[in-house]
Amino acid sequence: MKIEVCIDNIESVHIAQNAGADRLELCACLSVGGVTPSYSLIKSAVDFANIPCYVMIRPRAGDFLFSTQEVNMMLDDIHLAKQLGAQGIVIGALTKHADIDLSVCETLIQAAEGLGVTFHRAFDLCRDPVTSLEQLIQLGCERVLTSGQKASAVEGQPLIKQLVSQASNRIRIMAGAGINAQNAALLVKNTGITELHLSGKGYRLSEMPYHANAVMGENSEDDQKIWRTDFATIRAVKTSVEKY
């Protein structure tokens, strides 16, 4: 059983690895589902971590219908990820009709030659998951992250189980969205998945004794919180699925 932890700061890299993560997904802005991280975060994570680092390739929040300029930006980010020594990338592109954008994905995958490729939860917005999975297999993706096209992986268990059966070891199905120590083992048992994805989000309070009245986040409380991976959450999930 593999545990992938998505992170958006260097503190979380240390915490996730020490808690037992098997792989890191490097992002910025997890609050919007993750976008491409900075040069410095990729470099620092790759230099420090002794587990694989996969870089999110997503130029903005929102949908997964990308312009030509955005595709070119993603190509630049893939080249950077390779240059910095990342082990893989995380991509997803759809057509306006909610099908896999085969042309864009093929272009991105070709640019990533030599790296592992995960197709992210854009899959959960596809109108035909069965056909889409076959297309991702043909494209050469090594795994797809999915919640079973529901708000959480627990709700999406029926489709996840179906996808595991359909994949038949041709591609890995990684479940994500709402994973915790209370549901991880049952999800694995019910669906047959071999990989789990989570952020294990927690926070620590700012160490600054002086707090201005200015608001940088959505509310003043956010200004005093540093969001990061929670060690206990990752360790608990890891422990709960060890027998698998």
From Swiss-Prot:
Pfam families the record matches: CutC
One function term, GO molecular function aspect: copper ion binding
Coarse class of the protein's main subcellular location: cytoplasm
GO cellular component annotations of the record: cytoplasm
InterPro entries reported in the protein's UniProt record: CutC-like, CutC-like_dom_sf
Subcellular location per the Swiss-Prot or TrEMBL entry: Cytoplasm
Domain of life: Bacteria
Keywords assigned by UniProt, alphabetized: Cytoplasm
UniProt cross-references to SUPFAM superfamilies, sorted A to Z: CutC-like
Similarity remark: Belongs to the CutC family.
Name by which UniProt lists this protein: PF03932 family protein CutC
Organism annotation: Pasteurella multocida (strain Pm70)
Gene name linked to the record: cutC
